[in-house]
UniProtKB/Swiss-Prot annotation:
Lineage start: Bacteria, Pseudomonadati, Pseudomonadota, Alphaproteobacteria, Hyphomicrobiales
NCBIfam families linked: PRK11650.1
Domain of life: Bacteria
N-terminal signal peptide: none
Family affiliation: Belongs to the ABC transporter superfamily. sn-glycerol-3-phosphate importer (TC 3.A.1.1.3) family.
Protein name (Swiss-Prot/TrEMBL): sn-glycerol-3-phosphate import ATP-binding protein UgpC
């Protein structure tokens, strides 16, 4: 096992495009770190730099106290699991798992012991004679993980390994991956664009956007105290509601002091709706119900703020002006009708305040 430290890591491609813009973070020994962000944010590029599949322009990558910038991937003591499984179609499951060990000249008895142990852990012992084409997607992914396990690396690297699986199987496999990592105690770095996957897997969450790290913390810390409006809107489903604090149709007070300009955020589950206005500190909104989504135990209410002639709005990307919708999460049966006029309120302790450009959280 080993810790992984990135110090001011940068990647600039020929032509001047800067894909990674000075990334710093540390993954502790045995921790499960998830890099999460939208497509094109640089998360897979960063993982490939840790693996040695992509060169770095500047900075240092430290694995277990050793700077690996100039070290070949095969010598970094890491194992990588890919999205497309990367299995040899003409080889059996056993030979796929044993192939890398044979190339390293490992004795046959040790190879067999490692393969059998990995197969036992992953519950694929009855499949060792099968070819990949005879396996389901989930079984193939287990074989890919088994191939990584037999190497007994210091660090596991996962590049969106569940993207090709259906929704039900993704849930099952992410539980298996987390259980496996805890059992082995091996440091892991995992890339995904799925914020739910990230929240459920991570010890430490690294939220990326356009080549920079927006926030680092535990999943609960990032969800409860987002550092920027990007994080607030990306982490959480449905996302946090964001609005200009001084826009028409937004009334917010904190104790006896009214706030000034800025961006106000509130999670959908922290809004309470009623048919009559409530006199309370915090946030008060007038809404017209535009759409309703019933998803079993809960219902999402989409409303539009009641206001006239106000062009202001807020975006997770400064400079953009999205529709001025508000989302409220309520228990499954508690929903008004489309077209109803409602009032939504939130207590001060449930509100989040950001600077006007969305780049800084302001503590209340």
């Amino acid at each position: 096992m080993a810790n992984v430290v990135l110090r001011n890591v940068r990647k600039t491609y020929p032509g001047g495009f800067e894909a990674i813009k000075g990334v710093d973070f540390e993954v502790g020994d045995g921790q499960f770190c998830v890099l999460v962000g939208p497509s094109g944010c640089g998360k897979s590029t960063l993982l490939r730099m840790v693996a040695g599949l992509e060169t770095i322009t500047a900075g240092e990558i430290d694995i277990g106290g050793r700077i690996v910038n100039q070290i070949e991937p095969a010598d970094r003591d890491i194992a990588m699991v890919f999205q497309n499984y990367a299995l040899y179609p003409h080889m059996s499951v056993y030979n796929n798992m044993a192939y890398g060990l044979r190339n390293r000249g490992m004795p046959k008895p040790e190879i067999d012991a490692r393969v059998q142990e990995a197969a036992r852990i992953l519950e694929i012992g009855t499949m060792l004679d099968r070819k990949p084409r005879q396996l389901s997607g989930g079984q193939r992914q287990r074989v890919a993980m088994g191939r990584a396990i037999v190497r007994q690396p210091k660090v596991f690297l996962f590049d969106e390994p569940l993207s090709n699986l259906d929704a039900k199987l993704r849930v099952a496999m992410r539980v298996e991956i987390r259980k496996l990592q805890r059992r082995l105690g091996t440091t892991a770095i995992y890339v995904t664009h799925d914020q739910l996957e990230a929240m459920t897997l991570a010890d430490i969450l690294v939220v990326m956007n356009a080549g920079v790290v927006e926030q680092i913390g535990s999943p609960l810390e990032v969800y409860a105290r987002p550092a920027t409006t990007f994080v607030a809107s990306f982490i959480g489903a449905p996302p946090m509601n964001l609005m200009l604090l001084d826009a028409e149709g937004v009334r917010a007070r904190f104790g006896n002091a009214a706030t000034g300009a800025g961006i106000l955020g509130v999670r959908p589950e922290d809004l309470v709706i009623s048919r009559e206005p409530a006199a309370t500190d915090g946030l008060s909104l007038d809404l017209t119900v535009e759409a309703i989504e019933r998803v079993g135990p809960e219902t999402f209410i989409y409303g539009t703020r009641s206001r006239a002639g106000d062009p202001t709005a807020v975006s997770s990307k400064p400079g953009e002006l999205p529709p001025d919708d508000i989302i409220v999460r309520v228990p499954g049966q508690d929903a008004p009708a489309i077209g109803d006029h409602m009032f939504a309120t939130a207590l001060p302790q449930h509100l989040h305040l950001f600077s006007a450009d969305g780049r800084r959280r302001i503590e209340l």
